[in-house]
Protein backbone atom coordinates (compact mmCIF):
# COMPACT_ATOMS: atom_id res chain seq x y z
CA UNK A 1 0.00 0.00 0.00
CA UNK A 2 0.98 3.67 -0.15
CA UNK A 3 1.43 3.69 3.61
CA UNK A 4 3.76 0.70 3.54
CA UNK A 5 5.80 2.27 0.75
CA UNK A 6 6.00 5.60 2.58
CA UNK A 7 7.98 3.96 5.38
CA UNK A 8 10.73 2.66 3.08
CA UNK A 9 14.00 4.32 2.19
CA UNK A 10 13.05 4.50 -1.49
CA UNK A 11 10.09 6.73 -0.67
CA UNK A 12 12.36 9.54 0.44
CA UNK A 13 14.52 9.24 -2.68
CA UNK A 14 11.62 10.03 -4.99
CA UNK A 15 12.25 12.95 -7.31
CA UNK A 16 9.13 15.03 -7.73
CA UNK A 17 9.49 17.31 -10.78
CA UNK A 18 9.02 21.01 -10.17
CA UNK A 19 5.65 22.19 -11.39
CA UNK A 20 6.48 24.91 -13.89
CA UNK A 21 2.91 26.09 -14.40
CA UNK A 22 0.26 26.28 -11.73
CA UNK A 23 -2.43 23.65 -12.27
CA UNK A 24 -5.00 26.44 -12.16
CA UNK A 25 -4.13 27.56 -15.68
CA UNK A 26 -5.52 27.16 -19.15
CA UNK A 27 -3.04 24.42 -20.06
CA UNK A 28 -5.57 21.82 -18.87
CA UNK A 29 -7.77 20.19 -21.47
CA UNK A 30 -11.25 20.20 -19.94
CA UNK A 31 -12.97 18.56 -22.88
CA UNK A 32 -11.56 15.04 -22.78
CA UNK A 33 -13.83 12.00 -22.97
CA UNK A 34 -13.74 9.17 -20.45
CA UNK A 35 -15.04 5.73 -21.35
CA UNK A 36 -17.27 4.40 -18.59
CA UNK A 37 -15.53 1.56 -16.80
CA UNK A 38 -16.82 -1.88 -17.83
CA UNK A 39 -19.43 -0.29 -20.11
CA UNK A 40 -19.11 -2.98 -22.79
CA UNK A 41 -19.49 -5.89 -20.38
CA UNK A 42 -22.39 -4.12 -18.63
CA UNK A 43 -24.24 -3.59 -21.90
CA UNK A 44 -23.50 -7.16 -23.00
CA UNK A 45 -24.71 -8.61 -19.71
CA UNK A 46 -21.32 -10.03 -18.75
CA UNK A 47 -20.50 -7.71 -15.85
CA UNK A 48 -21.40 -9.04 -12.43
CA UNK A 49 -23.22 -6.86 -9.96
CA UNK A 50 -23.65 -7.86 -6.34
CA UNK A 51 -26.97 -9.44 -7.27
CA UNK A 52 -25.16 -11.83 -9.64
CA UNK A 53 -22.79 -13.37 -7.09
CA UNK A 54 -22.52 -17.17 -7.09
CA UNK A 55 -20.74 -19.31 -4.53
CA UNK A 56 -20.76 -22.98 -3.67
CA UNK A 57 -22.80 -23.72 -0.56
CA UNK A 58 -25.00 -20.67 -1.12
CA UNK A 59 -28.55 -20.07 0.05
CA UNK A 60 -30.88 -17.54 -1.54
CA UNK A 61 -33.05 -15.58 0.87
CA UNK A 62 -36.08 -13.31 0.92
CA UNK A 63 -37.68 -11.53 3.87
CA UNK A 64 -41.38 -12.17 4.50
CA UNK A 65 -42.82 -8.87 5.58
CA UNK A 66 -46.22 -7.81 6.94
CA UNK A 67 -48.37 -4.94 5.67
CA UNK A 68 -46.62 -2.14 7.55
CA UNK A 69 -44.15 -1.09 10.22
CA UNK A 70 -46.42 -1.99 13.15
CA UNK A 71 -47.46 -5.58 12.54
CA UNK A 72 -46.62 -8.31 15.06
CA UNK A 73 -46.24 -11.99 14.15
CA UNK A 74 -48.95 -14.06 15.84
CA UNK A 75 -48.85 -17.55 14.32
CA UNK A 76 -48.17 -19.63 11.23
CA UNK A 77 -50.19 -22.44 9.70
CA UNK A 78 -48.15 -25.52 10.68
CA UNK A 79 -49.03 -27.30 7.45
CA UNK A 80 -46.65 -24.98 5.60
CA UNK A 81 -43.66 -26.83 7.05
CA UNK A 82 -44.39 -29.95 4.99
CA UNK A 83 -44.43 -27.78 1.86
CA UNK A 84 -41.12 -26.23 2.86
CA UNK A 85 -39.54 -29.63 3.48
CA UNK A 86 -40.79 -31.00 0.15
CA UNK A 87 -39.21 -28.04 -1.66
CA UNK A 88 -35.95 -28.03 0.30
CA UNK A 89 -36.67 -24.66 1.88
CA UNK A 90 -35.84 -23.26 5.32
CA UNK A 91 -37.85 -20.82 7.41
CA UNK A 92 -36.26 -18.54 10.00
CA UNK A 93 -38.52 -16.85 12.55
CA UNK A 94 -37.38 -14.63 15.41
CA UNK A 95 -40.25 -12.77 17.07
CA UNK A 96 -41.78 -10.94 14.07
CA UNK A 97 -38.80 -11.21 11.73
CA UNK A 98 -39.39 -13.94 9.14
CA UNK A 99 -37.18 -15.12 6.27
CA UNK A 100 -37.34 -17.94 3.73
CA UNK A 101 -34.16 -19.54 2.38
CA UNK A 102 -33.24 -22.22 -0.14
CA UNK A 103 -30.52 -23.28 -2.56
CA UNK A 104 -32.85 -22.79 -5.54
CA UNK A 105 -33.65 -19.08 -5.95
CA UNK A 106 -36.66 -19.74 -8.15
CA UNK A 107 -38.22 -22.00 -5.49
CA UNK A 108 -37.67 -19.27 -2.89
CA UNK A 109 -39.37 -16.68 -5.11
CA UNK A 110 -42.30 -18.99 -5.97
CA UNK A 111 -42.87 -19.86 -2.31
CA UNK A 112 -42.64 -16.35 -0.90
CA UNK A 113 -46.32 -15.38 -1.11
CA UNK A 114 -47.50 -18.88 -0.22
CA UNK A 115 -45.63 -18.72 3.08
CA UNK A 116 -46.66 -15.10 3.62
CA UNK A 117 -50.33 -16.06 3.30
CA UNK A 118 -49.89 -18.76 5.95
CA UNK A 119 -48.87 -16.21 8.60
CA UNK A 120 -51.25 -14.36 10.89
CA UNK A 121 -50.20 -10.84 11.86
CA UNK A 122 -51.62 -8.34 14.35
CA UNK A 123 -51.56 -4.63 13.57
CA UNK A 124 -50.25 -2.81 16.64
CA UNK A 125 -50.87 0.69 15.35
CA UNK A 126 -52.30 2.34 12.26
CA UNK A 127 -49.86 3.64 9.72
CA UNK A 128 -51.60 7.02 9.50
CA UNK A 129 -54.77 8.58 10.83
CA UNK A 130 -54.86 11.70 8.68
CA UNK A 131 -53.53 13.24 5.47
CA UNK A 132 -49.81 13.93 5.88
CA UNK A 133 -49.95 17.70 5.32
CA UNK A 134 -52.59 17.99 8.04
CA UNK A 135 -50.31 16.00 10.34
CA UNK A 136 -47.42 18.33 9.51
CA UNK A 137 -49.54 21.26 10.70
CA UNK A 138 -50.91 19.73 13.90
CA UNK A 139 -48.22 17.32 15.20
CA UNK A 140 -45.66 18.21 17.87
CA UNK A 141 -42.55 19.96 16.59
CA UNK A 142 -39.09 21.11 17.55
CA UNK A 143 -38.91 24.68 16.23
CA UNK A 144 -35.60 26.48 15.74
CA UNK A 145 -34.47 29.83 14.39
CA UNK A 146 -32.18 29.67 11.36
CA UNK A 147 -29.78 32.59 10.93
CA UNK A 148 -27.99 33.97 7.89
CA UNK A 149 -25.15 31.56 7.24
CA UNK A 150 -27.50 28.60 7.66
CA UNK A 151 -27.05 27.52 11.30
CA UNK A 152 -30.07 26.71 13.49
CA UNK A 153 -30.53 27.83 17.10
CA UNK A 154 -32.86 27.04 19.99
CA UNK A 155 -34.11 30.59 20.47
CA UNK A 156 -37.42 32.41 20.73
CA UNK A 157 -39.23 32.43 17.41
CA UNK A 158 -40.02 35.97 16.20
CA UNK A 159 -43.50 36.82 14.98
CA UNK A 160 -44.03 37.48 11.29
CA UNK A 161 -43.62 41.19 10.70
CA UNK A 162 -46.40 43.32 9.23
CA UNK A 163 -46.23 46.80 7.72
CA UNK A 164 -48.82 49.61 7.74
CA UNK A 165 -47.28 51.53 4.84
CA UNK A 166 -49.89 51.54 2.08
CA UNK A 167 -47.17 51.63 -0.58
CA UNK A 168 -45.83 48.27 0.57
CA UNK A 169 -47.16 44.98 -0.79
CA UNK A 170 -47.08 41.78 1.27
CA UNK A 171 -47.52 38.36 -0.34
CA UNK A 172 -47.75 34.87 1.14
CA UNK A 173 -47.19 31.43 -0.32
CA UNK A 174 -47.30 27.77 0.64
CA UNK A 175 -45.66 24.77 -0.99
CA UNK A 176 -46.14 21.03 -0.31
CA UNK A 177 -43.84 18.18 -1.29
CA UNK A 178 -44.92 14.53 -0.83
CA UNK A 179 -42.84 11.60 0.36
CA UNK A 180 -40.36 10.59 -2.35
CA UNK A 181 -38.59 7.28 -2.95
CA UNK A 182 -34.99 6.87 -4.00
CA UNK A 183 -36.49 4.84 -6.82
CA UNK A 184 -33.32 2.86 -7.54
CA UNK A 185 -33.72 0.90 -10.75
CA UNK A 186 -32.67 -2.32 -8.98
CA UNK A 187 -33.65 -3.40 -5.44
CA UNK A 188 -31.09 -3.63 -2.65
CA UNK A 189 -29.06 -6.80 -2.08
CA UNK A 190 -26.26 -8.18 0.07
CA UNK A 191 -24.29 -11.41 0.42
CA UNK A 192 -22.78 -12.65 3.67
CA UNK A 193 -21.05 -15.70 5.14
CA UNK A 194 -20.27 -16.33 8.81
CA UNK A 195 -17.50 -18.87 9.27
CA UNK A 196 -15.09 -19.57 12.12
CA UNK A 197 -16.40 -16.59 14.06
CA UNK A 198 -15.86 -14.15 11.19
CA UNK A 199 -18.06 -12.36 8.66
CA UNK A 200 -17.28 -11.79 5.00
CA UNK A 201 -19.94 -9.49 3.57
CA UNK A 202 -20.62 -7.89 0.19
CA UNK A 203 -22.65 -4.66 0.19
CA UNK A 204 -23.47 -1.66 -2.02
CA UNK A 205 -23.91 0.65 0.98
CA UNK A 206 -22.68 4.23 0.70
CA UNK A 207 -21.05 3.97 4.12
CA UNK A 208 -18.91 0.83 4.16
CA UNK A 209 -16.62 1.85 7.02
CA UNK A 210 -19.39 3.17 9.24
CA UNK A 211 -21.47 0.07 8.51
CA UNK A 212 -18.58 -2.16 9.55
CA UNK A 213 -18.49 -0.46 12.97
CA UNK A 214 -22.26 -0.78 13.31
CA UNK A 215 -22.21 -4.50 12.49
CA UNK A 216 -19.40 -4.95 15.01
CA UNK A 217 -21.67 -3.38 17.62
CA UNK A 218 -24.74 -5.34 16.49
CA UNK A 219 -23.07 -8.77 16.63
CA UNK A 220 -20.66 -8.04 19.48
CA UNK A 221 -17.62 -8.82 17.33
CA UNK A 222 -14.30 -7.05 16.95
CA UNK A 223 -14.11 -5.14 13.68
CA UNK A 224 -11.11 -7.24 12.64
CA UNK A 225 -13.51 -10.19 12.42
CA UNK A 226 -15.65 -8.45 9.81
CA UNK A 227 -14.56 -8.06 6.19
CA UNK A 228 -16.95 -5.80 4.34
CA UNK A 229 -16.49 -5.53 0.57
CA UNK A 230 -18.11 -2.82 -1.50
CA UNK A 231 -19.57 -4.26 -4.69
CA UNK A 232 -21.65 -2.34 -7.25
CA UNK A 233 -25.40 -2.64 -7.01
CA UNK A 234 -28.15 -0.13 -7.76
CA UNK A 235 -27.12 3.44 -6.95
CA UNK A 236 -28.95 5.18 -4.16
CA UNK A 237 -27.90 8.88 -3.83
CA UNK A 238 -28.74 8.83 -0.14
CA UNK A 239 -29.86 6.25 2.40
CA UNK A 240 -31.92 3.56 0.69
CA UNK A 241 -32.28 -0.11 1.62
CA UNK A 242 -28.60 -1.04 1.14
CA UNK A 243 -27.71 -0.82 4.85
CA UNK A 244 -30.85 -2.69 5.94
CA UNK A 245 -30.32 -5.58 3.55
CA UNK A 246 -26.68 -5.89 4.63
CA UNK A 247 -27.71 -6.21 8.26
CA UNK A 248 -30.38 -8.77 7.37
CA UNK A 249 -27.97 -10.85 5.27
CA UNK A 250 -25.41 -10.83 8.09
CA UNK A 251 -28.08 -11.84 10.60
CA UNK A 252 -29.18 -14.80 8.48
CA UNK A 253 -25.63 -15.91 7.74
CA UNK A 254 -24.93 -16.06 11.47
CA UNK A 255 -27.94 -18.36 11.87
CA UNK A 256 -26.88 -20.53 8.89
CA UNK A 257 -23.14 -20.74 9.46
CA UNK A 258 -20.64 -21.70 6.77
CA UNK A 259 -23.05 -20.84 3.96
CA UNK A 260 -23.15 -17.77 1.78
CA UNK A 261 -26.51 -16.03 2.10
CA UNK A 262 -27.48 -13.95 -0.93
CA UNK A 263 -30.40 -11.80 0.16
CA UNK A 264 -32.22 -9.68 -2.39
CA UNK A 265 -35.01 -7.30 -1.62
CA UNK A 266 -37.98 -7.53 -3.95
CA UNK A 267 -39.32 -4.50 -5.78
CA UNK A 268 -42.12 -4.35 -3.20
CA UNK A 269 -39.55 -4.50 -0.38
CA UNK A 270 -37.61 -1.62 -1.90
CA UNK A 271 -40.68 0.51 -2.51
CA UNK A 272 -42.37 -0.13 0.82
CA UNK A 273 -39.54 -0.53 3.32
CA UNK A 274 -36.72 1.82 2.33
CA UNK A 275 -36.45 5.17 4.16
CA UNK A 276 -38.05 7.90 2.05
CA UNK A 277 -37.30 11.54 1.54
CA UNK A 278 -39.71 13.24 3.93
CA UNK A 279 -42.92 14.95 2.99
CA UNK A 280 -42.55 18.65 3.72
CA UNK A 281 -44.30 21.99 3.79
CA UNK A 282 -42.98 25.53 3.29
CA UNK A 283 -44.76 28.72 4.35
CA UNK A 284 -43.47 32.06 3.10
CA UNK A 285 -44.23 35.76 3.54
CA UNK A 286 -42.46 38.70 1.87
CA UNK A 287 -42.94 42.45 1.61
CA UNK A 288 -42.06 44.67 -1.35
CA UNK A 289 -41.37 48.36 -0.77
CA UNK A 290 -42.38 51.19 -3.09
CA UNK A 291 -39.29 50.48 -5.25
CA UNK A 292 -40.21 46.80 -5.61
CA UNK A 293 -37.32 45.68 -3.44
CA UNK A 294 -37.89 42.87 -0.93
CA UNK A 295 -37.44 44.44 2.50
CA UNK A 296 -38.74 41.49 4.52
CA UNK A 297 -38.59 37.74 3.94
CA UNK A 298 -40.04 35.01 6.17
CA UNK A 299 -39.61 31.34 5.31
CA UNK A 300 -40.57 28.33 7.43
CA UNK A 301 -39.76 24.72 6.60
CA UNK A 302 -41.69 21.79 8.10
CA UNK A 303 -40.47 18.21 7.71
CA UNK A 304 -39.55 14.93 9.33
CA UNK A 305 -35.87 14.10 9.81
CA UNK A 306 -33.44 13.45 6.97
CA UNK A 307 -31.05 11.42 9.12
CA UNK A 308 -31.86 7.92 10.37
CA UNK A 309 -28.81 6.14 9.06
CA UNK A 310 -27.93 3.24 11.36
CA UNK A 311 -25.15 4.06 13.80
CA UNK A 312 -23.41 2.51 16.77
CA UNK A 313 -25.92 2.49 19.62
CA UNK A 314 -28.83 3.18 17.25
CA UNK A 315 -29.64 -0.27 15.86
CA UNK A 316 -33.34 0.65 15.89
CA UNK A 317 -32.63 2.56 12.69
CA UNK A 318 -32.41 -0.80 10.90
CA UNK A 319 -35.94 -1.52 9.70
CA UNK A 320 -35.76 -5.19 10.77
CA UNK A 321 -34.79 -4.37 14.34
CA UNK A 322 -38.37 -3.47 15.26
CA UNK A 323 -39.51 -6.95 14.18
CA UNK A 324 -36.57 -8.77 15.77
CA UNK A 325 -37.40 -7.12 19.11
CA UNK A 326 -41.17 -6.64 18.67
CA UNK A 327 -40.47 -3.00 19.44
CA UNK A 328 -42.95 -0.93 17.45
CA UNK A 329 -42.66 2.45 19.14
CA UNK A 330 -41.60 5.52 17.20
CA UNK A 331 -38.26 7.04 18.13
CA UNK A 332 -38.03 10.80 18.42
CA UNK A 333 -35.48 12.42 16.14
CA UNK A 334 -33.30 15.28 17.37
CA UNK A 335 -33.06 18.49 15.35
CA UNK A 336 -29.73 19.17 13.64
CA UNK A 337 -28.30 22.65 14.04
CA UNK A 338 -25.25 22.79 11.75
CA UNK A 339 -25.16 25.07 8.74
CA UNK A 340 -27.50 23.88 5.99
CA UNK A 341 -28.21 20.56 7.67
CA UNK A 342 -31.20 18.42 6.62
CA UNK A 343 -34.49 20.30 6.98
CA UNK A 344 -32.97 23.79 6.71
CA UNK A 345 -30.60 23.15 3.81
CA UNK A 346 -30.90 26.18 1.50
CA UNK A 347 -33.59 27.72 3.70
CA UNK A 348 -31.23 30.69 4.04
CA UNK A 349 -31.56 32.43 0.66
CA UNK A 350 -28.58 33.71 -1.30
CA UNK A 351 -30.34 37.04 -1.89
CA UNK A 352 -29.48 40.28 -0.06
CA UNK A 353 -32.84 40.77 1.64
CA UNK A 354 -32.88 43.57 4.21
CA UNK A 355 -34.50 41.47 6.95
CA UNK A 356 -35.15 37.74 7.17
CA UNK A 357 -37.08 35.41 9.44
CA UNK A 358 -36.03 31.79 8.89
CA UNK A 359 -37.52 28.92 10.90
CA UNK A 360 -37.11 25.13 10.76
CA UNK A 361 -39.70 22.76 12.20
CA UNK A 362 -38.82 19.12 12.87
CA UNK A 363 -42.24 17.47 12.91
CA UNK A 364 -42.67 14.35 15.05
CA UNK A 365 -44.84 11.24 14.69
CA UNK A 366 -45.32 11.45 10.96
CA UNK A 367 -46.35 8.13 9.41
CA UNK A 368 -43.51 6.98 7.16
CA UNK A 369 -39.87 6.05 7.68
CA UNK A 370 -37.55 8.81 6.41
CA UNK A 371 -33.86 9.49 5.95
CA UNK A 372 -31.40 10.99 3.49
CA UNK A 373 -32.57 11.50 -0.09
CA UNK A 374 -30.58 13.58 -2.56
CA UNK A 375 -30.39 17.28 -1.49
CA UNK A 376 -32.16 16.60 1.84
CA UNK A 377 -34.33 19.69 2.46
CA UNK A 378 -32.78 21.79 -0.31
CA UNK A 379 -35.08 20.56 -3.07
CA UNK A 380 -38.20 21.75 -1.25
CA UNK A 381 -36.63 24.91 0.18
CA UNK A 382 -35.14 26.06 -3.12
CA UNK A 383 -38.34 25.27 -5.00
CA UNK A 384 -40.33 27.25 -2.42
CA UNK A 385 -37.91 30.19 -2.50
CA UNK A 386 -37.64 30.42 -6.27
CA UNK A 387 -41.35 30.02 -6.96
CA UNK A 388 -42.09 32.75 -4.43
CA UNK A 389 -39.46 34.97 -6.06
CA UNK A 390 -41.38 34.52 -9.30
CA UNK A 391 -44.68 35.43 -7.62
CA UNK A 392 -43.01 38.60 -6.34
CA UNK A 393 -41.49 39.52 -9.70
CA UNK A 394 -44.92 39.12 -11.33
CA UNK A 395 -46.44 41.33 -8.63
CA UNK A 396 -43.69 43.90 -9.25
CA UNK A 397 -44.08 43.55 -13.05
CA UNK A 398 -40.33 43.08 -13.44
CA UNK A 399 -38.49 40.59 -15.67
CA UNK A 400 -37.62 37.46 -13.62
CA UNK A 401 -33.90 37.72 -14.46
CA UNK A 402 -33.78 41.42 -13.61
CA UNK A 403 -35.78 40.96 -10.39
CA UNK A 404 -33.37 38.34 -9.09
CA UNK A 405 -30.29 40.33 -10.08
CA UNK A 406 -31.75 43.35 -8.24
CA UNK A 407 -31.47 41.30 -5.03
CA UNK A 408 -27.96 39.92 -5.56
CA UNK A 409 -24.48 41.11 -4.59
CA UNK A 410 -22.72 37.93 -5.73
CA UNK A 411 -21.15 38.55 -9.15
CA UNK A 412 -20.89 34.83 -9.91
CA UNK A 413 -24.63 34.47 -9.35
CA UNK A 414 -25.31 37.48 -11.58
CA UNK A 415 -23.03 36.11 -14.31
CA UNK A 416 -24.81 32.77 -14.09
CA UNK A 417 -28.25 34.30 -14.59
CA UNK A 418 -27.00 36.36 -17.53
CA UNK A 419 -25.49 33.22 -19.05
CA UNK A 420 -28.82 31.40 -18.77
CA UNK A 421 -30.64 34.38 -20.28
CA UNK A 422 -28.24 34.39 -23.24
CA UNK A 423 -28.76 30.66 -23.77
CA UNK A 424 -32.54 30.89 -23.73
CA UNK A 425 -32.67 33.87 -26.10
CA UNK A 426 -31.03 31.78 -28.83
CA UNK A 427 -33.97 29.36 -29.02
CA UNK A 428 -37.38 30.23 -30.37
CA UNK A 429 -40.39 29.68 -28.13
CA UNK A 430 -42.37 26.68 -29.33
CA UNK A 431 -46.06 26.88 -30.16
CA UNK A 432 -48.16 27.08 -26.96
CA UNK A 433 -44.94 26.98 -24.95
CA UNK A 434 -44.37 28.71 -21.61
CA UNK A 435 -41.05 29.31 -19.89
CA UNK A 436 -39.86 29.55 -16.33
CA UNK A 437 -36.49 30.07 -14.67
CA UNK A 438 -34.95 29.51 -11.26
CA UNK A 439 -31.51 29.45 -9.69
CA UNK A 440 -29.63 28.82 -6.46
CA UNK A 441 -26.25 28.05 -5.00
CA UNK A 442 -26.40 24.64 -3.35
CA UNK A 443 -25.86 25.04 0.41
CA UNK A 444 -24.76 28.62 -0.46
CA UNK A 445 -21.25 27.17 -0.72
CA UNK A 446 -21.22 24.55 -3.51
CA UNK A 447 -22.06 24.96 -7.20
CA UNK A 448 -24.23 27.69 -8.64
CA UNK A 449 -26.93 26.42 -10.97
CA UNK A 450 -29.60 28.17 -13.03
CA UNK A 451 -32.30 26.34 -14.97
CA UNK A 452 -34.73 27.42 -17.65
CA UNK A 453 -37.62 25.23 -18.76
CA UNK A 454 -40.11 25.43 -21.61
CA UNK A 455 -43.26 23.34 -21.40
CA UNK A 456 -46.74 22.95 -22.79
CA UNK A 457 -49.97 21.92 -21.07
CA UNK A 458 -52.46 19.91 -23.13
CA UNK A 459 -56.25 20.15 -23.02
CA UNK A 460 -56.08 17.01 -20.84
CA UNK A 461 -53.83 18.90 -18.41
CA UNK A 462 -50.78 16.81 -19.25
CA UNK A 463 -47.45 18.62 -18.89
CA UNK A 464 -44.87 18.09 -21.64
CA UNK A 465 -41.32 19.35 -21.22
CA UNK A 466 -40.08 20.78 -24.52
CA UNK A 467 -36.70 22.38 -23.83
CA UNK A 468 -34.39 22.89 -20.87
CA UNK A 469 -31.34 25.07 -20.41
CA UNK A 470 -28.82 24.72 -17.59
CA UNK A 471 -26.05 27.12 -16.62
CA UNK A 472 -23.63 25.87 -13.99
CA UNK A 473 -20.62 27.35 -12.20
CA UNK A 474 -18.72 24.62 -10.36
CA UNK A 475 -15.48 26.56 -9.98
CA UNK A 476 -12.52 25.50 -12.07
CA UNK A 477 -13.51 22.82 -14.55
CA UNK A 478 -11.53 19.60 -14.28
CA UNK A 479 -13.86 17.42 -16.37
CA UNK A 480 -16.49 19.28 -18.37
CA UNK A 481 -18.23 16.16 -19.68
CA UNK A 482 -18.63 14.89 -16.13
CA UNK A 483 -20.22 18.15 -14.98
CA UNK A 484 -22.65 18.06 -17.89
CA UNK A 485 -23.60 14.46 -17.13
CA UNK A 486 -24.17 15.25 -13.45
CA UNK A 487 -26.42 18.27 -13.97
CA UNK A 488 -28.38 16.76 -16.86
CA UNK A 489 -28.99 13.55 -14.92
CA UNK A 490 -29.93 15.62 -11.87
CA UNK A 491 -32.35 17.65 -13.99
CA UNK A 492 -34.13 14.48 -15.18
CA UNK A 493 -34.40 13.14 -11.64
CA UNK A 494 -35.77 16.43 -10.27
CA UNK A 495 -38.19 16.74 -13.20
CA UNK A 496 -39.46 13.27 -12.32
CA UNK A 497 -39.92 14.30 -8.68
CA UNK A 498 -41.73 17.46 -9.79
CA UNK A 499 -44.15 15.96 -12.28
CA UNK A 500 -44.77 12.35 -11.24
CA UNK A 501 -43.39 11.01 -7.98
CA UNK A 502 -45.33 10.50 -4.77
CA UNK A 503 -45.50 7.71 -2.20
CA UNK A 504 -49.15 6.76 -1.70
CA UNK A 505 -50.34 5.10 1.51
CA UNK A 506 -53.46 4.59 3.59
CA UNK A 507 -54.08 3.82 7.25
CA UNK A 508 -52.71 0.31 6.92
CA UNK A 509 -49.96 0.11 4.30
CA UNK A 510 -47.84 1.65 1.57
CA UNK A 511 -49.75 1.51 -1.72
CA UNK A 512 -46.87 2.37 -4.07
CA UNK A 513 -45.64 -1.21 -4.28
CA UNK A 514 -44.32 -1.22 -7.86
CA UNK A 515 -43.67 1.04 -10.85
CA UNK A 516 -47.39 1.16 -11.63
CA UNK A 517 -48.02 2.54 -8.16
CA UNK A 518 -45.02 4.87 -8.18
CA UNK A 519 -44.77 6.78 -11.44
CA UNK A 520 -41.44 8.12 -12.66
CA UNK A 521 -40.54 10.13 -15.73
CA UNK A 522 -40.31 8.18 -18.99
CA UNK A 523 -38.27 8.80 -22.13
CA UNK A 524 -41.17 10.48 -23.92
CA UNK A 525 -41.10 13.48 -21.56
CA UNK A 526 -37.38 14.15 -21.37
CA UNK A 527 -36.75 17.46 -23.14
CA UNK A 528 -33.85 18.63 -25.24
CA UNK A 529 -31.32 19.79 -22.64
CA UNK A 530 -28.61 22.37 -23.35
CA UNK A 531 -25.92 22.93 -20.75
CA UNK A 532 -23.46 25.80 -20.38
CA UNK A 533 -20.53 25.25 -18.00
CA UNK A 534 -18.79 28.41 -16.76
CA UNK A 535 -15.10 27.73 -16.14
CA UNK A 536 -13.77 29.71 -13.17
CA UNK A 537 -10.03 29.19 -13.60
CA UNK A 538 -8.23 29.41 -10.27
CA UNK A 539 -11.38 29.01 -8.19
CA UNK A 540 -12.03 25.99 -5.93
CA UNK A 541 -13.57 22.88 -7.48
CA UNK A 542 -17.15 22.51 -6.26
CA UNK A 543 -19.56 19.61 -5.88
CA UNK A 544 -22.13 19.69 -8.65
CA UNK A 545 -24.51 16.72 -8.59
CA UNK A 546 -27.21 18.09 -6.28
CA UNK A 547 -27.14 21.76 -7.30
CA UNK A 548 -29.62 21.38 -10.17
CA UNK A 549 -32.51 19.78 -8.26
CA UNK A 550 -34.16 22.79 -6.61
CA UNK A 551 -33.87 25.10 -9.64
CA UNK A 552 -35.42 22.36 -11.79
CA UNK A 553 -38.49 21.99 -9.57
CA UNK A 554 -38.93 25.76 -9.35
CA UNK A 555 -38.44 26.45 -13.06
CA UNK A 556 -41.09 23.85 -13.93
CA UNK A 557 -43.47 25.37 -11.39
CA UNK A 558 -42.78 28.88 -12.71
CA UNK A 559 -43.44 27.83 -16.31
CA UNK A 560 -46.66 26.17 -15.16
CA UNK A 561 -47.84 29.35 -13.46
CA UNK A 562 -47.42 31.23 -16.72
CA UNK A 563 -49.26 28.47 -18.58
CA UNK A 564 -52.15 28.13 -16.11
CA UNK A 565 -52.33 31.57 -14.56
CA UNK A 566 -52.24 30.04 -11.09
CA UNK A 567 -49.53 28.69 -8.80
CA UNK A 568 -49.86 24.93 -8.24
CA UNK A 569 -48.96 24.53 -4.59
CA UNK A 570 -48.47 20.78 -4.25
CA UNK A 571 -46.10 18.40 -6.00
CA UNK A 572 -46.26 16.36 -8.08
CA UNK A 573 -47.56 18.70 -10.78
CA UNK A 574 -49.66 15.87 -12.12
CA UNK A 575 -52.91 15.93 -14.03
CA UNK A 576 -54.71 14.95 -10.82
CA UNK A 577 -53.15 17.62 -8.60
CA UNK A 578 -53.47 20.40 -11.16
CA UNK A 579 -57.12 19.58 -11.86
CA UNK A 580 -57.90 19.28 -8.16
CA UNK A 581 -56.51 22.74 -7.42
CA UNK A 582 -57.97 24.49 -10.46
CA UNK A 583 -61.43 23.07 -9.82
CA UNK A 584 -61.23 23.92 -6.13
Cite the ranges covered by each PLM segment:
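Cofactor-binding beta-sheet edge motifs in enzyme active sites
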Residues: 1-584
